[in-house]
């Protein structure tokens, strides 16, 4: 897996984690219990395995997107450079 994570905030309302994925690295299959927002720090291509499907997303640095809770997925760096993003979980 070659992933590095850095938990930056962890309190009753939010959990903020920076993820660094080397080319080909992945997060491992997981599920978020709460809604969350992802903010890419670098441009890059993300490969996502979700619900038996393979999806691709081209990320643009600074352009955030929302994801709902409950979807099991594995995120891969689908590019040839390090992929860095910040994940903001909105805890209930």
Residue ranges, per PLM feature:
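Residue-level marker of beta-strand positions
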Residues: 26, 45, 63-64
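Ligand-binding loop in jelly-roll beta-barrel domains
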Residues: 69-91
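Short acidic-glycine-tyrosine-enriched beta hairpin
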Residues: 13, 52-70
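Conserved short histidine dyad/triad with adjacent acidic residue
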Residues: 15-32, 49-51, 68-69
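Conserved hydrophobic/aromatic beta-strand scaffold that supports enzyme active sites
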Residues: 7, 16-20, 64-66, 85-87
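Local beta-strand/beta-hairpin segments that build beta-sheet-rich folds
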Residues: 2-9
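Short, conserved beta-strand element in jelly-roll/cupin
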Residues: 31-47
